[in-house]
């Protein structure tokens, strides 16, 4: 099993920080403006960061590369049979839908100097097969029929997709993706806070 984790994109992080420092002139959202915990400058930083993250829509946080090995058999008139084996590598991406993030998911404790962010649930993207690296082995009389070969190919790819989704849902991979999401989003909030002169504020992200 091979796992690859996409590096945090520095340009995106810079965009969040610069977006706050240069362009933000909007009033603070009323739902947090009068909570009694937020200082106005910190609130503006957090509000702008949330909007920037929402603009990201789906944030890619983790990728898994695996291999599906499946096979299928067919018979015709109880006399002729065919078998096809398929081995195909594929990549599955993990996302957090940040368009669902709101200021209600962000809280700030000035005394503890702590920002808490509640993240939307982790989602898994579609399976991206690497067809150029796939291997197919056909056997049996039915494999002389191109239509039968194509029918078995379609069945095998359905099975391969299911196999990859099952692999991607393993607890170890889900936990790794969640950890990466927490690290990425925490960094998204910490950088503009540091620029705003609040390096003392710690950010903790958790899932809802």
Predicted regions and their residues:
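Domain-level marker for long, solvent-exposed, non-transmembrane regions
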Residues: 2-208
């Amino acid at each position: 099993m091979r796992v690859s984790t996409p590096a945090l994109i520095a340009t995106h992080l810079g965009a969040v920080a610069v977006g706050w420092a240069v362009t933000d002139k909007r009033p603070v959202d009323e739902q947090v403006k009068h909570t009694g915990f937020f200082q106005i400058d910190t609130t503006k930083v957090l509000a702008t960061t949330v909007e920037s993250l929402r603009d990201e829509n789906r944030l890619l946080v983790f990728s898994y590369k695996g291999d599906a090995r499946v096979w299928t058999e067919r018979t015709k008139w109880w006399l002729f049979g065919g078998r096809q084996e398929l081995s195909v590598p594929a990549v599955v991406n993990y996302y957090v839908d940040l368009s669902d993030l709101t200021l209600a998911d962000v809280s700030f404790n000035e005394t503890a100097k702590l920002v808490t962010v509640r993240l939307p649930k982790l989602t898994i993207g579609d399976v991206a097969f690497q067809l150029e690296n796939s291997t197919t082995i056909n056997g049996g009389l039915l494999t002389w029929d191109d239509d039968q070969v194509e029918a078995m190919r379609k069945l095998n790819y359905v099975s391969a997709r299911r196999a990859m989704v099952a692999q991607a849902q393993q607890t170890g991979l889900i936990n790794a993706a969640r950890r990466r999401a927490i690290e990425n989003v925490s960094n998204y909030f910490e950088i503009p806070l540091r620029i705003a002169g609040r390096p003392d504020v710690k950010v903790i992200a958790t899932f809802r």
